[in-house]
Every structure is written in structure tokens, then in C-alpha cells.
């Protein structure tokens, strides 16, 4: 039986707390700290952060929250006891601004964790598969009859749950490396680490720091807790001296009837199931939940089949490693749409996979030179200024049995606000094909 978890200190009435970033998690953290009697300063480097949200700004000021917009200055952090950075803000940017001997820098999730009433937590991290696995775990727990909160890095911040006053039986939380880096006492009853491949190296100084952040998920666990890890992490985990009971999962495939494509989803399913077993979820209920589970948008999402050609939206594919996973999910010829703001990675390492599985590549937007340099001579490639002509080009010459797959292997920020917008555009384009 796991012992009651030790939590970090809570803010004291009258102490100063600085929240950096006026996004959803920052607003939730500011409200929680305000509720606890702190003097709250809400900072955002974007001078237009509340443009069109004037009523919200007025509401926050009514609560006593001070809002300061524009470049951050050291005096904004004076006398701070807590500093809660935006999940997307590298902690290194606070150097020279925060007196770390006086102020504690902590993630919004760490802050909210300190105000929970001992609800058990199932937390999921990894370079890829986090959202699907967290959603699967929530579905399995729900099938068993639990009242479940699903949130964290997916949807609702944990601070919003704390403020709501609701009480769930189990909290299922997706958590990123950004959040984990400033978690000090956060401790899930069951923690899942699916995989680690190069990502977010514009945020973390190197791969070692990124890996260290991911393994912080387990640092406060004890022998009564559970650590579920992808089989590929077995040797790496040995370096970290995990105290929790460990289970390693592979793509062997326990369940039948899943609508999720790809061997990587067998890993996601097994990881969710192993974590849910700790809460008494039966294999039968897990299987029922999985049979009803619909693929999440933009993750190897079947859009439509037109005259025997399958169109698949994998806009969430933003890295080279996730492109590899996407290509391995199909045993039929793939006509690949990719391109965008390249984040780095070894595209040349996919040469054999591209040569054997991809019949044509349509590049769009930025980053074309990376793909052309890595795959020149392996497969016919064309470049298009935007997504629509790229999709239409591949669709026009596709044969029955082909897959037209959008798996960009890049971020979307050259042409779109986010990967969701890019995926929606792909679905719009495909929906108009005839």
C-alpha cells in the first residue's frame, strides 16, 4: 500500500506569488494562489495578451490580481515566494530575474498537487503517445465505474480541478517535460513513461536534460507505487534507481478489436491497462473501453476513403521519430505529405523505410531542403507553397490501395497557428475531393 504522499509547502497568506504567462494554466494558477490569500502578480511578455479579453482582465483585477504586460524585469519578481512559469517557458529565461534562494520556481501542476485531498493520480508522459494513453486510461477507469478527471497538459489544468471543488476517484494527468522540470514533490500513484526520443531541444539545453526531466515523474515514488515504462527504456531506467515497482510494456498486443492504427498504439494500450490494473480495472472492462475508443483527432486519424484510396491525418506528427512510427503503421503504399518548420532529427535515418514504403512525397511550406537533402533519389518529390496543392497532387495520381498520409514531421508554425489547425485544413481539403 502506498503511503500518503509528502507535498511541498503551500503559499502563506500575504506572501507574493508571480505567475508568468496568461494562458489557461497561468490563469488557473493565479486564481488558485489568489484564493489562498497570496499577493498575485500575473505577467505576460505579450503586450496584447488581453486584447479582446478586457472583461477577463477586469475580473482578475477585481480579485486583486495585478496584471503586468511587456518585457519581464527583475523588480517584477521582488519578494516573490513562488514563481509559476508558463509550461512553454524555458526555466533558463528566469535566470537573472528570480532570486532562487528566496523564491521557489514550480510548475502549475506542482502547485495544484499541493492542494489535492489525497486523490490518487495516474500520470502519463513520453515524447509521443501521451494524450492517447491518458485518454485510454481514463476510458478504462470510467468503464470500471470510477469518477475520473482527465486533464493536466491535455485540456483542463489541474488548478482548475482544485478550484472547482469537485472530487474525482482518480485523476488522470498528461504531463510534459516542461512541467516535470519544475515539479519537486509531485508523485503519481501510477506513472507511465512511454518513450524518449529527441524533441523540445529548443527548450531543454540538451538530450540529457530532456531525459532527466522525463524521469522526474518517478523521483518521489516509493515501493507501493507503480512505474510503467516502454520496453525501449529498460536500460536507461536502470540509471535512475526507481523505487516503484516497474512494469515494461511492448507492442505484443493483448487486446483485439482496437480501431487504433500502428504498433505504437499497442504499447499505448498495454501501458494504460497496466497502470489501470493498480486501481482494480479488469481486463474485460479494459477491452470494452478500448473497443469503444475512437482515435483522437490528428493522430493517424482516418479521414475518408475515396475510390479505394485512404486519406489519413497525422498532423500531430511533428518529429522525425513520430514520422517513423506513422510509416510503420501501414502495409500498403504510402503517398506522403510532409513539410513545415523543421525541428531537427535524422531524416536520413528513415531512408530505407521511405524507399520501401513511400511511393511519392509532396512537400509543402518551409523546411523542404531538409527532406530533399535526406531523400534525394529515393522517391519522387515535389514541392508546393501550401497544403492544398500538395494533397491534390498526390490524390490525382493515387491508385486503389494507396494511403495518402499527412505526417509532416515538423511543427506547423510556418503556415498555421498549431497542429490542430493544420489537421483541420487537411480534412477540409480531403472532404472536397471528388
From Swiss-Prot:
NCBIfam families to which the protein is assigned, alphabetical: murD
Annotated family: Belongs to the MurCDEF family.
Catalytic reaction annotation: UDP-N-acetyl-alpha-D-muramoyl-L-alanine + D-glutamate + ATP = UDP-N-acetyl-alpha-D-muramoyl-L-alanyl-D-glutamate + ADP + phosphate + H(+)
Assigned keywords, A-Z: ATP-binding, Cell cycle, Cell division, Cell shape, Cell wall biogenesis/degradation, Cytoplasm, Ligase, Nucleotide-binding, Peptidoglycan synthesis
One of the GO BP terms on file: cell division
EC id: 6.3.2.9
Protein localization: Cytoplasm
InterPro entries: Mur-like_cat_sf, Mur_ligase_C, Mur_ligase_C_dom_sf, Mur_ligase_cen, MurD
UniProt-annotated binding residues for ATP: 126-132
Annotated pathway: Cell wall biogenesis; peptidoglycan biosynthesis
Coiled-coil residue spans: none
Cytoplasm in keyword set: yes
One GO cellular component, as annotated: cytoplasm
Function: Cell wall formation. Catalyzes the addition of glutamate to the nucleotide precursor UDP-N-acetylmuramoyl-L-alanine (UMA).
Gene behind the chain: murD
The name this protein goes by in its record: UDP-N-acetylmuramoylalanine--D-glutamate ligase
SUPFAM superfamilies assigned to the protein according to its UniProt record, in alphabetical order: MurCD N-terminal domain, MurD-like peptide ligases, catalytic domain, MurD-like peptide ligases, peptide-binding domain
GO molecular function list: ATP binding; UDP-N-acetylmuramoylalanine-D-glutamate ligase activity
Xref: Gene3D superfamilies: Mur ligase, C-terminal domain, Mur-like, catalytic domain, NAD(P)-binding Rossmann-like Domain
Amino acid at each position: 500500500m502506498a503511503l500518503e504522499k509528502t507535498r511541498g509547502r503551500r503559499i502563506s497568506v500575504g506572501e507574493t506569488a508571480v505567475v508568468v504567462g496568461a494562458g489557461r494554466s497561468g490563469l488557473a494558477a493565479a486564481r488558485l494562489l489568489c484564493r489562498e490569500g497570496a499577493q498575485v502578480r500575473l505577467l505576460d511578455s505579450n503586450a496584447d495578451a488581453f486584447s479582446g479579453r478586457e472583461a477577463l482582465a477586469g475580473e482578475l483585477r477585481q480579485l486583486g490580481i495585478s496584471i503586468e504586460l511587456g518585457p519581464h524585469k527583475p523588480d517584477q519578481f521582488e519578494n516573490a515566494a513562488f514563481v509559476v512559469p508558463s509550461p512553454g517557458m524555458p526555466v533558463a529565461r528566469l535566470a537573472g530575474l528570480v532570486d532562487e534562494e528566496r523564491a521557489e520556481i514550480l510548475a502549475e501542476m506542482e502547485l495544484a498537487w499541493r492542494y489535492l485531498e489525497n486523490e490518487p493520480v495516474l500520470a502519463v508522459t513520453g515524447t509521443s503517445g501521451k494524450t492517447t494513453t491518458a485518454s485510454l486510461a481514463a476510458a478504462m477507469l470510467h468503464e470500471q465505474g470510477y469518477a475520473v478527471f482527465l486533464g493536466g497538459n491535455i485540456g483542463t489544468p489541474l488548478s482548475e480541478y482544485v478550484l472547482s471543488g469537485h472530487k474525482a476517484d482518480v485523476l488522470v494527468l498528461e504531463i510534459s517535460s516542461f512541467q516535470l522540470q519544475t515539479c519537486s514533490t509531485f508523485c503519481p500513484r501510477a506513472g507511465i513513461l512511454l518513450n524518449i526520443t529527441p524533441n523540445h531541444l529548443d527548450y531543454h539545453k540538451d538530450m540529457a536534460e530532456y531525459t532527466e526531466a522525463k524521469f522526474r515523474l518517478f523521483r518521489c515514488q516509493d515501493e507501493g507505487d507503480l512505474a510503467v515504462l516502454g520496453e525501449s527504456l529498460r536500460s536507461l531506467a536502470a540509471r535512475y534507481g526507481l523505487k516503484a515497482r516497474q512494469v515494461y510494456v511492448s507492442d505484443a498486443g493483448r487486446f483485439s478489436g482496437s480501431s487504433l492504427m500502428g504498433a505504437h498504439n499497442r504499447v499505448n494500450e498495454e501501458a494504460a491497462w497496466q497502470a489501470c490494473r493498480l486501481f482494480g480495472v479488469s481486463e474485460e472492462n479494459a477491452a470494452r473501453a478500448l473497443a469503444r475508443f475512437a482515435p483522437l483527432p490528428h493522430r493517424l486519424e482516418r479521414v475518408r476513403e475515396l475510390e479505394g484510396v485512404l486519406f489519413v491525418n497525422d498532423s500531430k506528427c511533428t518529429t522525425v521519430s513520430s514520422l517513423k512510427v506513422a510509416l510503420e503503421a501501414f502495409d500498403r503504399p504510402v503517398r506522403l505529405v510532409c513539410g513545415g518548420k523543421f525541428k531537427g532529427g535524422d531524416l536520413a535515418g528513415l531512408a530505407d523505410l521511405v524507399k520501401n514504403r513511400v511511393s511519392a512525397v509532396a512537400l509543402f511550406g518551409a523546411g523542404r531542403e531538409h527532406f530533399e537533402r535526406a531523400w534525394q533519389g529515393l522517391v519522387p518529390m515535389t514541392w508546393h507553397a501550401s497544403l492544398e496543392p500538395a494533397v491534390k497532387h498526390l490524390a490525382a495520381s493515387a491508385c486503389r490501395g494507396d494511403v495518402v498520409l499527412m505526417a509532416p514531421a515538423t511543427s506547423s508554425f510556418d503556415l498555421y497557428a498549431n497542429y490542430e489547425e493544420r489537421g483541420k485544413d487537411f480534412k477540409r481539403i480531403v472532404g472536397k475531393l471528388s
